[in-house]
Design a protein with these regions (language model features):
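Small-residue packing motifs within transmembrane alpha-helices
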Residues: 2-5, 45
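Sec-dependent N-terminal signal peptides
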Residues: 4-12
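Bacterial Sec-dependent signal peptides at the C-terminal "C-region" and cleavage site
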Residues: 12-23
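Surface-exposed ligand/attachment interfaces on beta-rich extracellular proteins
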Residues: 34-39
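Globin-like tetrapyrrole-binding proteins
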Residues: 50
Length: 115
């Protein structure tokens, strides 16, 4: 009987444990190294374009509430501040060939958590 209860408990735990959805992100057009080679104007244009792209994610089915942190955080910053955040983050990255779209998301997410 003890074994049966243990087995039932194990099955319940396994089935109740939330599964995480795997998401594949395409590499995009630029690497972290490409960003460092951009002019200041290009860096500001890139980061604001990246944010604009993330803000239209609901068009592709992303829940709008998932963007609240980005709207709140980026709405308080200038394009210069956003580019500065990304520049610092990219310089600290060990992999210059990292996909810039993912690096940008991570940089913004980290910066916004500290505000």
């Amino acid at each position: 009987m003890k074994y049966l209860l243990a087995l039932v408990a194990l099955i319940v735990v396994i089935n109740v444990h939330p599964t995480q959805q795997t998401v594949k992100i395409s590499p995009g057009f630029f690497t972290a190294k490409d960003y460092l080679d951009m002019t200041d104007t290009e860096k500001r244009a890139y980061v604001t374009g990246q944010i604009n792209g993330m803000l239209v994610a609901p068009f592709f089915g992303a829940p709008e509430e998932n963007l609240a942190w980005l709207k709140t955080c980026s709405g308080k910053m200038s394009d210069e501040q956003l580019a500065s955040i990304l520049s610092r983050y990219v310089r600290d990255q060990p992999n210059p060939q990292a996909n810039l779209n993912v690096v940008t998301f991570n940089a913004l997410r980290e910066a916004c958590r500290h505000q």
